[in-house]
Amino acid sequence: MAKLQLMDTTIRDGQQSLWATRMSIGDMLPILPKMDRVGYWAIEAWGGATFDTCLRFLDENPWDRLRLIKSKTPNTRLSMLSRGQNLVGYKHYSREICFRFIEAAHRNGIDVFRVFDALNDIRNVVDNAEAIKECGAHFEGAISYTVSPVHTLDSFLEYGQQLKDLGADSIAIKDMAGMLTPYRTERIVKAFNAEIGLPIHVHCHYVGGMAPANIIKSAEAGAAIADTASAPLAFGNSHPAVEMIVAALEESRYDTGLDLGLLFEISEYWEEVRKRGHYKRGVSSLTHMKVYSHQVPGGMMSNLVSQLEIQNALDRLDEVMEEIPRVRAEVGYPPLVTPMSQIVGTQAVFNVLTGKRWSVVSKEMKDYICGYYGKAPGPMDQEIVAKVVGDSQVLDPDVAPGLLVTTTFAELEEEIGDLAKSEEDVLMYALFPNEARTYLSKHRTSEKVDFLLEEESSQTKEEDYVDINQIRELVRVAEESGVGEIVVEEEGARISVRMPGAMCAAPAVPVAVPAEAVPAAQVAPAAEPAAAPADNASRPASWHCVTAPMVGTFYAAPAPGEPPFVKVGDEVTANQTLCIVEAMKLMNEITSEEMGVVREVCLEDATPVEFGTPLFYIEPHNSHDAIGPESA
């Protein structure tokens, strides 16, 4: 029996599960050379939510991150997680985009592609598999493990055979919710070894605490590889600690052969990063122990807590946890893994926060119910289906959802224009258009400012000298604060930094600037979330106020450049879409509750909103029966 090999998940799934994927590349770089010396089977370094959060929260280029990690780990394979037809996004992408993305990821440093589909629908894996085999990388087909009346050992084996037929080099049992038990693990690994005959890779989140025992039983049953994380990013929603597994298997025939001393040096580094970032340790609470009921994965748990905090509703976490399995059963028992974890979890949040189950439904949930994510594992509640689907077109179950996406690389390249300087930039835009456009615009502006400053400095006389570093600091302040323009006057000199699309700032106020300080400046304030108007007396009591059911961003149109869903004077029908509120990474259609006329659109496009912010006022056709704004 061969020794058990280990893959490190610290900088991908470990931080996604415990730190909401907020680890920066600066946190990683100093320790990567030591991690490269360990002798891991691979380091999981990319994919999952890391691509998204680089752009949304960390102001990092995910492609640059990958290249930097590769440069520091030349002796260790790098692995990434792909969501199949969703790649690292939350919707399906065309075959061409899948192929280009896989090829670019391999070119920039990825050696192992772990590919899963949230529904275990093999049709959503085909494009990834063919692209991986074409570029000569390692294709690890992953099975989304879950427990439900429709998920059986036979169904998992059938899917494993389909992955093998696509050319899988190894099979991952992906237990994202920590639902495996030691003896379930043993049975599954033995069955896969006997019937599939590929190396088995066990991925088991700690959550309820059984993962270390699962890994030991998997080794005894013949598993080849297991996932672990460095102790400061282990336990709780994450994975078992690598130090624990290495010590547990020492002097056995499964001995990993890894150096515990080196592993502890690495964990001491991560402990300092944890303290510096004020991140909590991974622990298993009573809520975690209830995983065998709610089945919420580690990464989903941390993001759910984060999103409830944004909604100012963290005190309702227990209610949401109780609602999740109910929603899951109603929509056919999808495994709770991205994107289904977000879709089901967000629906549970809406059901709890609004107090009216299924009154608000995200576009993504509607698409799933209509078949656009793939085939549901089990039957759905037909009353829910009828309520959600309405007049929407349901996809023929014999049609693979990916075939409907025909967007070409050339079309995307034309859309993003000169902002994209490489194939990777266009792919970034393909996956996250709004975030990529914002990121690329900002950084192209910075590059232009640097160029102009260099040109200016070469032509400036000594007596007219301007401190270029001071100006760069102003640019940084403008970028980070989101203001339109910063103007500073010092000793008769006037410096203005204006961001793209900004209006002119008010006249500058002279200030005294110490040489070592950041210049004080008069700035236009960043946008605040819209709030309810103080006085509704000017509006008839019969008008119905449509309010935001959640904290998020108001969008008046389905996409940039398209006409708004409705405008003042439009007739609307019951259940007609009025706008979108983006929250928790999902686009949530807000609909009219009744027939009427739009009398007021309260917000500009892309305005942040709080719970209860007025969005529209609608005059019902039967005004005497209408609900007034004070009771909406």
Task: Locate the predicted segments by residue.
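Active-site mouth loops of central-metabolism enzymes
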Residues: T10-P30, L81-I97, F116-L119, A142-S155, ...
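Conserved, mostly hydrophobic/aromatic
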Residues: G14, M35, V115, I171, ...
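Terminal or standalone catalytic/regulatory effector modules within metabolic enzymes
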Residues: D36-C54, S285-V291, Q295, G299-V466
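Active-site beta->alpha loop and helix N-cap motifs at the rims of alpha/beta catalytic domains
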Residues: G47-K164, I171, G178-P182
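Glycine-rich phosphate-binding active-site loops on the catalytic face of alpha/beta enzymes
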Residues: V115, D175, A221-S238
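Catalytic cores of alpha/beta
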Residues: D154-Y159, G208-A221
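Acidic, compositionally biased tether/linker regions
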Residues: K442-T547, A632
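Structured functional modules or segments
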Residues: A517-A632
